[in-house]
Amino acid sequence: LASANLEAVSDSGYLGNPYRAARVFGAAVPENVPRTRSSRALNLRAIGDLGSPNAPRSAIRGSYRYFWDNWDVKSHTVEGGYSRYVGESFLLDGFVRHYRQSKASFYSDDAQVQNTYVTRNRQLGTYSGNTLGGKVTYSWRKVPGQYEINFNGGLELLRYRYSDYTDLRSGGAYGLDASVLQLYVTANY
């Protein structure tokens, strides 16, 4: 099964943050971003069933997303994953994702010229990220056509690296490493 989606978004109004400051010649100045933003995204996805009548149900998936906007931000996201049932009650799922983004035309860590628009919002800067994740779903109670109750647990390991954003505490490039643990119950009826 495969899909291709094209997304178009147009924003207008106050798109900045009144509490965020940019740096110009080392001095803090209020952030100023355009009041309009138009973006597009192309998303390609495919999923395939790997199971056979005598083997556990399993599937592999892959996706690619390209994003661009009129602020000159461009990004690429590539993701791959694998899912497999273990017995009748457990579903195991794993994935890996890579993200890469270029900076907005008015982004600067420390601007050396005063322009109309300026921001130091690191999410509009150049950065890349990698995620490795896994999830386990246990089907506790299930009556087809009536209800299903599942226990879920997931773990994601994230790493983001910003190439043109200085951590003011250390003077080096900013980075983020995180582990996200999720435990939750779902009920469908």
Region locations from a protein language model:
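Outer membrane beta-barrel transmembrane domains
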Residues: 5-47, 52, 63-79, 83, ...
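Aromatic- and glycine-enriched pocket-lining scaffold segments that form the walls
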Residues: 1-3
